[in-house]
Amino acid sequence: MPASRCDNDLKVDFVVPSRDAANPTLMHQLKNMQCAGQIINTHEKPLSIARKKGVLQADTEWVAMVDDDMLLPANWLQSVTKAITPKIGAIGTVAVHKNKHIAAYERVVGTVYNLSKLDTNPHINNIIIRRKLMENYDPPRLFFGEDQYFKRYVQKTGFAWKVLPFLGATHLGTSKNYVTIGISYRRYGHFGFYKLVRRMAARFIFTPFAALSNLSVKTFWYLTKLNVEFLAGWVKEIVLEKL
């Protein structure tokens, strides 16, 4: 059973979408987390639909959505709920990556810019959201790339989307198809041309430093591969638009 004591009297149900059996380590963390209500493990597909249906099964005003490939510290929920204000609709937190190549890149970027202020990453993999916002949400049928679409939806309702600095969340780094992500970012208008150029410039500048921080040529080629895949997906979608 979830831990019952809750210092701020705000219970929060959890939604954990997963393809198969839920991550046992994450489930153990949630069951013992202060302020946690019921844990809803859903296997709907795609992920965007699973999130919506799961949240609507919850009974609490605020609902936590946590991806199956995440790990959270014991005080995660209490720390996040402290940031709730009447104007906020969703709150995410910066997570550290288990994937050493991506972790190196974000570590380098974080030395020059606050990762919680980056407008290109809403951190949808560990957030709390007002349940009522899901009632009229019409999610695209996506497994990857829903982040920006969902953030814009929340903002259009009049609420703010807030990202907190690193509180201890860990992303275990499920492999993603960056061609698919590039297609989604173009198709659903996540990035305009300016943001695309900004992303590519940042990746070009910081990738060598990430490789240097790991002392690994493999890190350089891994990150370069992701960048090329993302751009290929973006260009592919533009070509399809013209046909």
Q: What name fits each language-model region?
A:
Residues 97-98, 110-129, 143:
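A recurrent flexible, glycine/aromatic-enriched loop bordering the glycosyltransferase active site
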Residues 75-104:
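Conserved donor NDP-sugar-binding/catalytic core segment of glycosyltransferases
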Residues 178-243:
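Non-catalytic, C-terminal membrane-associated alpha-helical segments of glycosyltransferases
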Residues 67-71:
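The conserved acidic donor/metal-binding loop of glycosyltransferases
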Residues 143-152:
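Acidic donor-binding loop at a coil-to-helix junction in glycosyltransferase catalytic cores
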Residues 63:
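Short aromatic/hydrophobic "clamp" motif used to bind/position activated sugar donors
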Residues 42-58:
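Glycine-rich, basic loop-to-helix element that forms the pyrophosphate-binding segment
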